[in-house]
Amino acid sequence: MKNYIAYDFETTGRDARFDQVLQAGFIIYDQNLKEVKKLNIRSRLNPDTVPSINALKVNKLNISSILSEKESYYEMTLNIHKLLSEFKNSYFVGFNSINFDEEFFRQILWEHFLFPYLTNTNGNLRLDVFNFATMVHAFRNNSINVNKNESGKINFKLENLAKSNNFNFQNAHEAIADVEVTMKLMKMLIDRNSDLFMNFTENSSTKKVEQRIISEKIFTLHNYLFNSHRVYLVKHLIKHPIYKSQLIGFDLKYDPAELIQYDHNSLYEVYKNKSFFRKIKINKQPTILDRKYASSMEPYLEFTEEEIELKNQQLDNKQFLENLEIVLKRESEEYAENKSQEIPYEEETIYS
């Protein structure tokens, strides 16, 4: 069974390539969510880093304190690495971590000449509790309380979820406090939705996600964008010919009968300007579920099984799939041609 390595960073800004981690909180939990080890650590501000005023306000830090911390950024990184080197086959858990904390994590390891991909190698996987919370709310909204903001839109910020679900959270944006609340939230959701948690953990494996999508052919895809849930019933089409971590699907609320007859030039125009297609990044823990979830919701509820199956068969058209592959290659080539020709700074070359 896997341990859970829950973590959170407080930083000088939002740019993982140039900003710095000022606070790092790590708590190791066993398979029963009992605490095993804890690391709460800070670093001294690097002389070449200018912190964002907004970041300092959010994190309740001042310049004098971050300039007088005992440990350097390098020393903090070594302490983190020493702790984590004891653990393998673990889940790295965070809140909105795949899009934020993980990029900082990789950057600080890489900049200090350490292997940067700890979270998804050596049997390790990633669990982003933000994805779990939004998934649960989309399909079982009585399992989690979510407040609305001043504009009347649902709000999934960690401190707001803590308040609406009655968690004690006195030190929001203190790294170790954020870790503790993230795990409280995950435990509450597990207790109420053990089946969805199983689904959530399976989505953390790139290999399992790909196998599931290919084998099931039709599935539910959930995204949370711009303060709203987006639920799609999707038919898997092909793997991206250039970007191997992307699968391409078709939104089954649309009729493909005419589309499959297009040549690749006409299809390219549709691909660019319409929302028929869905890109699934299988290495970013996408929210993939059984087709029954989307099938029970509008607009897919209006279609019969026979209508869905007809679309499924139409989209298996060999010439259409070959044309789609041409379209994807063309898109990739145009992206490469339009990409900035400026030589990147060294800090920006982690994926080069």
Residue ranges: model-predicted function:
Residues 91-96, 100, 104, 142-207:
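Acidic, Mg2+-coordinating catalytic module of metal-dependent nucleases/exonucleases
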Residues 203-280:
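Acidic catalytic cores of enzymes that act on phosphate-bearing nucleotides/polynucleotides
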